[in-house]
Amino acid sequence: MAPDSGDVNPAGGRPTDIADLPTFHHPTLSPSGDRVVYYHDGSGRNELYIQSVDGGDRRRVSDGEVPRDAGWHLGWLDSSTVLFHRDEGGDEQNDLVAIDVETGDTETLVAPDGQALCFDIAPGEFLVYGSDAGEQMNLYRYDLETGRTRQLTRHDRPVWSAQVDPDGERVAYVCNEADDLDNRDTYVVDADGGEPSCLEVGETGAECHPHDWFSGGDRLLLSDDSRGRSRVGVYDFREETVTWLSDGTHEESGVVVAPDERVVATRVREAAVVPVVYEEWAGDGPAEARELDVPEGVVEYGYLPDGDRITANGGLLLPHSTPTRRSTLAVYDLDADDRRTLVEPDHGPFDPDRFVDAEYVTYESDDVPPWCEDGEAREVGALLYDPLEGSAADDGAALPGVVWVHGGPHVQAQRSFSPYVQFLAASGYAVLRPNYRGSAGRGREFQHAIHGDWGGMEQADIAAGGRWLADREWVDGDRLAVIGGSFGGFSAYTQLVRYPELWAAGIAWVGITDLPALYEESMPHYRSNLERQMGDPEENESLWRDRSPIAHVESMAASVCIVHGVNDPRCPVSQARRFRDALVEQGRESGKDGGFEYVELGEEGHGSTDRRQRRRRFELIGEFLERRL
């Protein structure tokens, strides 16, 4: 049997103590590139700290003024002022707040009736942010000197991300005005407003994203997946042409343009995210990329920009982790090919050599369920964690297994350090993290295969992963659980009602149960994404209802733990309450000895980086699995 999650294990410390290991988030360089600001929770909660890129001790800036959850990125308004996002208990209705790094004084700059996301900053002049204060997520400009706000775009579909050019004259951003809902184009608009122009880069239906401007403002680093995989290229505004750097072998995305015009990008390879540099790229064909000398893992650059990545002395700011090494913040010397650590990972009482490594595996998913009309077999990649090779002792007994399903769906289970997986492995569970169809990292066709098919073949992929894990001789196939959050929570619910014979238990975290209701309750930009994923909710009403887990609640046999933050704006808590009520109508009782368990988390939304809340999640997961498996 699995050990109690409170027992001391051979890695040192109790598995639940992994939740308390100090963590940093969103390292962001100052405009001069000589300092970095980041969230760090070494004090017990997330606070802001500043550190020189040359090393030395970090200095604390905030004292409770910032949110407990460091979920949103930071930015520098000028050399002495940092911007952060502040919401109420995880509701994501962010205000944009400035904090003086010397005095700690704060000032709310932007407080819309809705959500605000800072996309980029022209230091000392203005910031560009997205807001759904109107009928859709659009771009706005806030002038730092006058305090005035003006709307820059008026699209009917959401704007995603933006980049201000070096002179503060133009803004590149992502939107879609095509009939094809999968399409994403890069637009450019004057920083004072006006009519935006669309860059003619790829084919309709492809995604084109801007990443960084060149110093003269006449070229733009971008990526496009018209040929199936995302390629990095340089758009020349003078010639209106693109020079492609990537050869299309791997998924690649741009990161930053160095002052000497070397281009840094990331490359996805078997769930690892590798930093690469293109040093000489002028010409007609693909250029040669050099992979940076870091352990195989994940360079942790977020979806939204955390400012520049090049330090004052020309180094690359590099946050990185591996399956067995927690996040490290380093400065990488692109010339010498070595790195210097700024923030060391704190492993506390744990021996990192005893953490469980991730093995990249593949399996066949060839079972087409009867509710899928056009399903086809696929090879699915996944990460396998075998605790018999790591921190858990081999007592000769088969281990219970957990299939951990990522959210998104257009993200990927990657070879970064996962405290949740290491907690499970240290507690004696085998873990599989499948990258089902719809996941990122394998090209456009694989990623889009889920569109119009939520609850269909991607769930067949997950179930096939469960059967594959159960077939390992060291796994007890009768003690298998499925866990996931957000879309992963939708998957946990769906697995339990569609494949009831496979699972002994499940945990659905901030999950989706009723798709039509979710659409009605969503923010406008999330409605647009749901339409992209599942089509028009009225024209496809029967599909939306049939693929909702709540429509099949009577088929569920295993026990489920339903966990939901009461302030979740993406998957509202009403999704959990509807499923709970449906279970009660089926005659199930709630409680530790009942047919299901139900927990609502106060002061929490769609997840949290707060240490206290993280430990609470560890305890909920560990105690439920111990009871049910």
Sequence positions of predicted segments:
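The conserved beta1-alpha1 loop
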Residues: 405-407, 564
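Active-site-proximal cap/loop segments of hydrolase catalytic domains
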Residues: 439-629
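Terminal disorder- and signal-encoded targeting elements
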Residues: 1-20, 512-513, 573, 618
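Conserved beta-strand scaffold positions in the cores of enzyme catalytic domains, especially
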Residues: 196, 360, 431-433, 598-600
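Peripheral, non-catalytic segments that deliver or gate enzyme domains
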Residues: 2-4, 15-26, 31, 35-72, ...
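Conserved alpha/beta-hydrolase
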Residues: 428-443
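Hydrophobic beta-strand anchors of alpha/beta hydrolase catalytic cores
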Residues: 400-404, 431
